Amino acid sequence: MSEEISPNDRKFITNLLTQKNQESLLLSIGDKISKKKNKKPSKRIILITKNRIFFLKPSQNKVKKDIHLLDIQEIKSSTSNEFTIVAKVDNKQFSYGLITNKTDEIINQIRVTFNHQFFGCPEESTFKCTDIKDSRLVEIEQKDLPCGGFVETYQSICDHLGVPPRDDICWDMTNIISSKNIRSFNIGEIELPTSAGDTIRCLLGALKYNNYFKSFNFNNYTFNKEQFGYLAEVLKCNSTVEDLSLNNVGLKHDTMPIIATALSSNKNLALTAIDISNNQIEDKGMTAFSSYVASSLRGIASLDVSNTNCNKAGISVLTNALKKNIKMSSTLSYLNLSGNKMEADGSAGLSSFLASPNTLKTLNISNTTPSMETIVGALVIGCAELKTIDISDNKLTKKEVPHLVRFIGASSTLKHFNLSGTKVPVENLKELVVAITSNIYLQDVVLDLKNNDLGIAGARMLASLATDKLSNVIYLDVSENDFGDEGVSVICDGFVGNSTIKKLILNGNFKQSKTKSRPSAIESVISLLESECPLETLHMTVGNSKSPLKADILSLIYSLATNSSLLELDISGHQMGPKGAIGLGKALQTNKTLHTLIWDDNLTTAIGFAGFQVGLERNLTLKNMPTPLNDIIQCHREPKFQQIWKEIDSCINRNQSPTRAFEGNGGNSIGATNLSFLASGQQQGVEKLLNKIKSIGRKVTDPNNILIVKDAESTEKVIGGIHLIKESIHASLEMELNQKLKDFVQVVNDVINAKKNEMTQQILESMQNTFQSMDGPTIKRLATTIQYGSKDVDEQQIHSTLVKGAGAELSSRAHECFISALDIASDYTYEKITIGLDSVFKDLILEESQAQNEASGATPIPDSPVPTRSPQPTSPPITPQPTPTTNVPPVTAPRTGAAAPLKPANPPPVSTTTTPPVSTTPKPTQPVSKFGAKLSANSAVAEAIARNMGGGAPPIRKPVAPEPEPEPVTPTKDVTPLKSKPVVAPRSTPTTSTPTKTPVKKPSGPSVPGSLSDAPESDSAELTHVTASRPHIASKRKPPTRRPRPPTEN
């Protein structure tokens, strides 16, 4: 009957739709059902849109009735020629009916439209269809709408309330939330105006009829009492939400009952996680909430009621409700009661729940003043699955510690133990730590001990347990414990031998007053990083101590250049200035493991950032670096800073992307080795030994020693050669890998196209078998359209993914393997060459000593400027003790000057078979052709040689201040009296008949600092870079060789 609508009416309808921003879904005309039986029926036009139903009187251009879909309560229709709509608008109920032969079409259109606009509306909230046979009702097809129709529902709610819908909310829901399959509704993602009452009401109204979201997050938005009522309506209807977070939303003792009542009334509620923390609920509000907890049909898995200003009464009611609900023992896994005052009554209520068998995995009772004895006893009985316990900020007494020790000993699942702020005495803390380490069932434990004022005593206690006791702790936080320089040094030295710790937090432990132990403390940190300890993360910020290390931290920065274990470093707040930033840049050029660096608040200037940027350009492993905002704020106005920071950010983005420099790099391989820097430390050691050998002034005659010296002189060439071999092999690998991946690009492209064709064929077959109306030509046209109209995989994209992406990662991993093999070969070579040169040096020293002894014992010394006198009968020469390798006493050294005895005319020859050779080390300025020092203390000298030169493993750490070493000089004929000095004697060797050469047993390792092998090679000043050699220990990860730290200034 739409043909009976006049053009004038149609024009009015068009204007109405434009004004209401609606579109027509159905337009018809009929006779109005009048309540008066004798009254003549009048015509009415019915217009159905997405949100409303309009009834208009023809030729009057006036809307007689306007009904929103949500206002409809019932539709009655006993016959297919008439229907009546019962609605309620502004709390006034009315009915409106029409007589029309399109009754069924109109009813079904209203049903379909309502279902489309309110897709998730529960059945009890929809209008009723009364007296309508099922045969008249069509089946409604369900559509897959973004976010379960949230946008349509939101727009309809806005229309119902007369509020303009926000296009940004609709766009976000359609293009972000839905496309990313995000099931959490977060109010923080929506930009709310200052007065957001209408927006919140519309959003909550849409959530009431939506089943898409499974989590509601309203954190930090303050609701008023009216808005809590709207939220309660949502919770009464929603049947899909599982996680409700109301952290800091303004809940109070008078609004909490509104929410609790709504939760209790919804029998279909699927809620399993509730967060009502940081609200002033108090005991009264907690009592109302506990009524829901006790009656929850499904139980609760996670419950957070922290900082709700509840006292023992409120906590007691809540814990009793947990025990009353039988579902809680099998569902509750997370319970947070922190920030409330439990005291004895609350502790008793909690223990009554914990004592029963339960599935609790995390318990947080920090800052609750609990009765530890009561709670711990319940933990031992019922909490067999507890993994995390937080008792921080509760002052522990000596009486309570044994109860915790008992719980730790009985646990087999504990992973995280938080004791921060408990001020537990050191001796009692040791009991707890020992209990953790003694429990063989506990593994990978996270131990938080920060802010306990442990001091130096606590540091010593932890250090004493670190090596062999803390075998199951992987994370240790000892921040803000007032260790000071000495304590930091002690705790780092203690963990050198630990084999499990992976993350160590030392924030805020340096005191404001710098002590003499500061360099030693920093050196201890460096030694910890270079040791066998598997430490991967180190945080050493200034913390709350406000005592920055400034320039003292530079040595730690420089040590990163050769560190091969640390993955994450935080040194924020130490005010190291631009010098530290430049040092970081230089260290990053050779560091190949650090991937996270945090270094804000270090007084870094634009010059410092520029130096850092230079190093970062040559580093491919640093991927995470939080923006140092404090330093940027201070220097963002400096010239060229913006460009510098853009380049730094570009380098970080490059490292985060897998498509790094792989092909077309002009021969600059990934992570190319800086040969001169890597080899300088060990190579200098070899050159130093060669110079010492030359300084003796004696020619090497032994064939084996000649080969050793020649090999040593070729070391630099050989090491350089193997580095070039590595670079060549890596370059060839990149070429081969590049070619293989390029060939594989075509293979992948063919596979994708084949699968696409297979899918197309199956689609066509399915459609041809299903749709009888589609003939062969139609299917053929569809196949052609798919073939030429659908999107193909770009071969260039496959090339980029495989060659530049996967290829770069594979090349980088292979390069790491090559570097590892190269390091082993280099270290082995230098070790063997150093041992050989050390042996040659000792042989030459022995030969020189023998020659000097023979010369001093057989030939008179002419032109002696010192007069001689007869020996005193009361002062006989000192007879030395026999050495372990001979039974004949060694020859007594002759005296010079006034104390020298008279020489016989024919001095007896010196027997080389019974007298071991003796050498001395005179002062550099004194001739040594005639020895005035006593040479009789051979046993002590031999012991010194065995200690300093005898092939033992070198020390792990380089000493802070090495002792000065004597310089050897060439013997001359002029002799002056010598003062008594430590005498360097040869090692004990088997006697031979050859007077000029004594076979020497080769030492088993390089010398230690302070031995003869560490003497300077000439009278010139000692080398600027001195690197202590490191032992070669067979282990999973070999500690790196200490190399010279890069200087930061000339």
Curated annotation (Swiss-Prot):
Residues 851-931, 945-1050 are annotated as: Disordered. Residues 1033-1050 have a biased composition (Basic residues). It is found in: Cell projection, Pseudopodium. Pfam families: Carm_PH (PF17888), LRR_6 (PF13516). GO terms for biological process: cell migration; regulation of Arp2/3 complex-mediated actin nucleation. One of its GO terms (cellular component) is actin cytoskeleton. Disruption phenotype: Cells exhibit a striking defect in the formation of dorsal, cup-like, macropinocytic structures, a concomitant reduction in the rate of fluid phase pinocytosis, a significant decrease in the efficiency of chemotactic aggregation, and a decrease in cellular F-actin content. Keywords: Cell projection, Leucine-rich repeat, Repeat. Its main location: other. Residues 1-179 are annotated as: Required for interaction with capping protein. InterPro entries: CARMIL_PH (IPR041245), Leu-rich_rpt (IPR001611), LRR_dom_sf (IPR032675), PH-like_dom_sf (IPR011993), PP1-Reg/Actin-Interact_Protein (IPR051279). GO terms for molecular function: myosin I binding. Gene3D superfamilies: Pleckstrin-homology domain (PH domain)/Phosphotyrosine-binding domain (PTB) (2.30.29.30), Ribonuclease Inhibitor (3.80.10.10). Induction: Down-regulated by Pseudomonas aeruginosa, PAO1 strain and PA14 strain infection. Serves as the scaffold for the assembly of a complex that links key players in the nucleation and termination of actin filament assembly with a ubiquitous barbed end-directed motor. This complex is composed of at least capping proteins (acpA and acpB), the Arp2/3 complex, type I myosins (myoB and myoC) and carmil. It has at least a modest ability to activate Arp2/3-dependent actin nucleation. CARMIL localizes along with the Arp2/3 complex, myoB, and myoC in the leading edge of cells and it plays a significant role in the structure and function of these actin-rich cellular extensions. Belongs to the CARMIL family. Interacts (via PXXP domains) with myoB and myoC (via SH3 domain). Interacts (via N-terminus) with the capping proteins acpA and acpB. Interacts (via the region between the LRR domain and COOH-terminal proline-rich domain) with the seven member Arp2/3 complex (arpB/Arp2, arpC/Arp3, arcA/p41-arc, arcB/p34-arc, arcC/p21-arc, arcD/p20-arc and arcE/p16-arc). This is Protein CARMIL. It comes from Dictyostelium discoideum. The gene is carmil.
